[in-house]
Amino acid sequence: MADLAPHQQVVRSHGPAAGKIGGINHLVLFVGDLEEAVTFYRDVLGLEIVRTQPRFSTNALSLQGKALMSSGDLGNEALVDHSVRQVFFKLGNGELFSVYEVDGVEPEPDASVVSFLWPDGSSKPAERPAKLDHLSFDVASRDEIVWFRDHLRSEGVVCSDLVERRGSDDSHRFLTSIYFSDPSDNPLEIATFDWGDPGWEGYDFDAWFRDPEPVPTLLVPRT
């Protein structure tokens, strides 16, 4: 290890929890109009609705009788109190994605920290990073990315062209993506690793560790 460059010394997995988290359980976005969101995510992006929540109040009193708190305590009882509706969508790999419509709150998310990737006109300008930077959906191949780009544009959605993260000689390969926003200006991405591409055969994944000056914790796990 001592003879390797710092970016080649990254400790990739460590500790008793290694490998126990199998994927994303769910993500939640705020939306300004639930009907618009359902139309967009179900009818345009093709996600399956698997759960709907009736309007509920986001306070400790309303939670009692609806959820079991193992500690017996309800924290942050006075922190928030809004009227919320929620819809859950299922992705093709079984992971869940959800949207909140919140009464009395203008959910104008600020920009992604990589907002230059989104095309002009796809979302409102902003001054600080969003709480959830962006949501990226996975598809199986580059052909599906092309299909979604054309499909979204046919639906009137402002969508970027393909962003291909690979060197001109395929020396570094990563994602192929498109960028767009939902009707509530939440920044979205559809991406693929395109694992069926023959270019992955024999690929050296050490190339994914690119930071020449990794933060110290990446190199030395907690003892």
Feature map (PLM): residue ranges:
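Vicinal oxygen chelate
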Residues: 1-17, 23-32, 87-92, 113-223
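Core segments of cupin and vicinal oxygen chelate
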Residues: 30-107
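A short, polar/proline- and glycine-enriched secondary-structure boundary/capping micro-motif
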Residues: 108-114, 199-202
